[in-house]
């Protein structure tokens, strides 16, 4: 199994798709990397030679921030926003959407499952 920057690439997938399993590499970066190294995007990950793996590894490490480094940077950015108390930091702290999405309805993935609140009691008949 081919390993790049600590990630096992799926053997049966085309390289264009397999490279997107690396955090920080999407379709565009995958295609840029393959073009720069001269490897066909249609090639399967299982067919990579050791030389091609080294080329891919060197190109990705030299040009992009990926995996652990990128995760640490994103976490540090969020932590900084929370510490300075800016609007985005407050939204992160409260677990609400940060980028202006509506919250009256929806936003369930950010807010978590609904928590039922007791309603107002109706007075009984006599």
Swiss-Prot record:
GO terms for biological process: translation. GO terms for cellular component: cytosol; small ribosomal subunit. InterPro entries: Rbsml_uS13_C (IPR027437), Ribosomal_uS13 (IPR001892), Ribosomal_uS13-like_H2TH (IPR010979), Ribosomal_uS13_bac-type (IPR019980), Ribosomal_uS13_CS (IPR018269). Residues 95-126 are annotated as: Disordered. It comes from the Bacteria. The keyword Ribosomal protein applies. One of its GO terms (molecular function) is structural constituent of ribosome. Keywords: Ribonucleoprotein, Ribosomal protein, RNA-binding, rRNA-binding, tRNA-binding. It holds the Pfam family Ribosomal_S13. Belongs to the universal ribosomal protein uS13 family. Located at the top of the head of the 30S subunit, it contacts several helices of the 16S rRNA. In the 70S ribosome it contacts the 23S rRNA (bridge B1a) and protein L5 of the 50S subunit (bridge B1b), connecting the 2 subunits; these bridges are implicated in subunit movement. Contacts the tRNAs in the A and P-sites. Part of the 30S ribosomal subunit. Forms a loose heterodimer with protein S19. Forms two bridges to the 50S subunit in the 70S ribosome. This is Small ribosomal subunit protein uS13.
